[in-house]
Amino acid sequence: MLAGLDLDSIFSSLLSRGGECGELFFEEVRTLSVLLEDGRVERVLEGTDSGIGIRLVFREKTYYAYTTDRAGDAVLSLARDLSRYAEGGGVPVSLPASPTMAENPSPVRVPPSTRGIAEKVELVRTMDRVARGASRSVRQVRATYGEAERRIEVAYHPGVFAADRQTFTLLTVQCVAGNGSGLTMGYETGGGTAGWEFLEEVLPGTLAEKAAGRALRALSARRIEGGRMPVVLSSEAGGTMVHEAVGHGLEADLARRGMSVYRDSLGTRVGSPLVSIVDDATIPGKRGSFGIDDEGSPGRRTLLVSDGILRGFLYDRLLARKEGVPPTGNGRRESYRHRPIPRMTNTVILPGTSSPEEILRSVDRGLFVRKMGGGQVNTVTGDFMFEVAEGYRIENGRQGEPVRGATITGNGPEALGMIDRVGDDLGFGLGTCGKEGQGVPVGDAQPTLRFGPPFLTVG
């Protein structure tokens, strides 16, 4: 789409009074969502949104505007308006003549737009039917299907003109169970960057069974006695801890502003020698994967922590330029209405050599976490608190009775240092990460982990 505009005139106007960089970002997104609640299809929404964002950076300040009018005159007028924030002489424009299409790590075999609404409604009906069939104690079921087909083009001075297509599919199911002792909830989700073929791996009935089972088991669960104790995080728990307690602190903008516990730790030990962490946008099919980020930088695998030593941060183009380092492909934005900022993609603690069964057997008494819930993190201090959505007592090296209402508190670098067993498995989670009012799709992953002395605090 951008190739159809007079980019030379637009960029010449944008940079007519100077600027370190200028950018045009085009986005077109088609979305469809289906919501089923209380046994009824409540909503089927389909729509398309498109627009162009324009960015000017002058003396390290960012000026941003956007328009839904894709006509060349409208974009040129907006570029002229932004140029008024600069003061100085013009900048010679250097751009390729046409965009380079990114090599996407998740090629789509069956675009979801080629399948009918009835098939998509049947997916949520299946989740509702399976969840309710698990037990009469299942009181409520909320099931959703979502898809998005996103096309982006990025023209970035100096020297970048790139394009990408990204397809997302997602199923979620939430179950509420109840008896005389109260109400409990179970939640499960599945999907990623894939077309309709995602159903080869993500089975609606299986998601519903897991969500209903989690809610039902919680009905008979008891609270655990609090205190410091060994904690085993199953790979099934997903990477909530690495994303929240570690990943945000490694986004370069937070570190640069002094808002990260890791701000002065590059090259120093921040965790156990058993811990290595990467951020990887190139993993096929995962929710945080892409061919290019929202500044036109290729998606890549970035080493963050190697054998417990902090090796790097996550950069967008602007911060990388300020610090004299290469961008890491982490400049992301929610839409054309937003400026890009450093964000995670798929953040992963790499697998080790211990079997999950061996790790569990190594603990006499403690807490075994199968699913993490929500939580809070102070990125400045590294302190965190997470809820446990599904947990069990560890009794004599075995999974014991379920617990409810448990929390885990600790500190990011201290917790990484407590990891003394790392499993040879790997489990992925997915979600939408919020930061500065923007939500972007992300993935996270971890193997089974054991947190040893001085132990996390369980509440």
Model-identified regions with their sequence ranges:
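N-terminal small-residue-enriched
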Residues: 1-459
